[in-house]
Amino acid sequence: MENFQRYFLMFSILIFSYFLLIRWDPPNENSSENSISIDSERPLINDPIDFEETAPFNENLSNIKAIDNVCAANNIKTLESPYWSLDIDLKKGEIVKTTLKNYPVEIDSKGKKILFNKCGPEKYSHTSGFEFLNKELNPDKNFFSVKETYTSDNKIFVVLEKTEKNLLFKKIISYKNDDYFVSVTDSVLNVSASEVTLAPFSKIDRSSVDLNADENSIFNPASFAYLGPAFQTSSDNYNKISFSDLSEDNFRELSTKGWASMLEHYFISAIVPEEGTNFIFQARKSTKSDVFSIGLVGETNSIAPNREASFNQKVYFGPKIKKELQKAHPELDLAVDYGWLWWIGQPMYSAMSFFHNLTGNWGWSIVLVTILIKVLLWPLSMVSYRNM
C-alpha cells in the first residue's frame, strides 16, 4: 500500500509540474507588433486596416434589402463535388452557402448540414479580394462572370473575371472532389495609366447566433460546445477568442504563418493563407449588427501600370476530422479542442482511428482502445494488487 501511495504522489507531482510549465508565460521582449522585424521593403499598412473601415467590410448586415439580393439567387454560381455544394455570389465573389452532402442535420434526416449560410440567422459567409487605398470602386455595378471551367491534375478550376475602373479582377477557385476545402487565387491587373495601392484581405463573417441554443441538454453536447473564433499565429499555436471577448476588444496580431477559423461543435470553417508572407490576423465585432468578422489583411503593395498582384489561400468548410483538416494545413487539426486533457485525448483519438480503419466500426474501436489501455496500465495495476 505504501508503494502505491508513493507512486500516486509522484504521478500527481509530475502532472502538477507539467501544467505549471505549460501555463507559465515568460515575458516576451518582442511581443509588440512594432518590435517584430519584417524582411520586406514594402511596409505593412501603417494605419490598421479595420474590417469595419474597409469597403468590403462596411456593409450593414442588418439591411434586409441587401441580404434579400443575395437570397434571390439571381447572381449565384454553384460549384459541386461529391462531398459538398458551394454557392458563390457573383457580386463580390463571396461564398454565401455551403451544403455538406454526407452530413444530415439529424440522424435519419433528409436535410443536410449547411455551414456557410449568409441568408440564415448565422449570416455566415466568406469574402476575399483587395482593398484599395487610393481608388474607390463600386462592386454593385460590376459583377463577376464565369470565364472558363476546366480540369487539370485531378483538380477542377473555375475562373471568375470582372473589369472595373481599368482594373481586371480574376478569382480562380480550384478543388478536388474528395476535399473539404477550395484553393482561391485572387489577382488584379492594373490596366490604367497610373499606379494603384492595395492590400489583400480574406475574412469570415458570422453572427453569434447558436442554432443549438434551444436544445440545452446534457444529452446534446452541441448545445454547450464552444462556438466562436480560433487562431494559429507565429506566437501561439492555438488561441481561442470568444465572441464575448471580441464584444469588449478587437484582436490583432502580426504573423507570417497560421490560420483563422470559426468553430462549432462538429464543424469548422477556416482561412489558410500561404506561409512566409506578413499578415495581420484580425477579429472584431461589427458596430452595426451582431456579426463578427475574423480573417487577415496583407501588406500594402503599389502596382504599376500593366502589372499584377495576386493572393493565394485555402478556405476550409467541413467536419473536424483530423485527416481532412491536415489536407488544408498540417496543423489545422489543432483547431479540434480536446480540452485540458488534450495530451491524453489526442493519442486516444489516433488509436481509435487506427482501430476504426481495421474494423470499420466505432464500437469495436472503443472496445479495442479499452483493452489497449488495460494492457499499458497493467504494470501499475499489478504493483497496486501486490500491495493491497
Language-model features: locations:
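Juxtamembrane interface at the cytosolic side of transmembrane helices
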Residues: V375-M388
